[in-house]
Amino acid sequence: MATPSLRGRLARFANPGKPILKPNKPLILANRVGNRRREKGEATCITEMSMMMACWKQNEFRDEACRKEIQDFFDCSSRAQEARKMRSIQESLGQSESLSPHKMTKLLQRFPNKSHLI
C-alpha cells in the first residue's frame, strides 16, 4: 500500500477539532464494570521449595537428612499464608489499595454518568 502523501498528512493536522477516527460507540463511561477475577499473584516460597527438592534428590528422598530445608519451606509457607489472610481481612474492611469490581459497580450505579453527549 502506498504511503500517504505529505499533503494528506498535513491536512489531518490542519483541522485539530475534527477527529481522525469516528468511534463506533458513543464515548460515554458505563455505569458498571466487568466482573473479572483478581490475579492470584506470584507463587511464594519457590526458592525454599527448590532447595528442599534438591536436598531430597541428593539424599534419595530421606526426610531426616533434609530436616532444615523442610522446616525452612514450612516456615515460609506459613508466613505467606498469614500474609494472604491479612490481605483478605484488609480487603473486607475496605483498607485495600483498589476496589473490587462488585464494589466499583455499586458505586457507579449509585452515582451514574450522564447518558448523553454534552
From Swiss-Prot:
**Does this UniProt record's set of keywords contain Transmembrane?**
no
CHCH domain: which residues? 42-84
Which superkingdom is the protein from? Eukaryota
* InterPro entries on file: CHCH, Cys_alpha_HP_mot_SF, Ribosomal_mS37_met
The UniProt subunit note reads as follows: Component of the mitochondrial ribosome small subunit (28S) which comprises a 12S rRNA and about 30 distinct proteins.
Disulfide bonds, paired cysteine numbers = 45-76, 55-66
Species name for this entry? Mus musculus
Q: According to its UniProt record, where is this protein mainly located?
A: mitochondrion
Protein name per its UniProtKB record: Small ribosomal subunit protein mS37
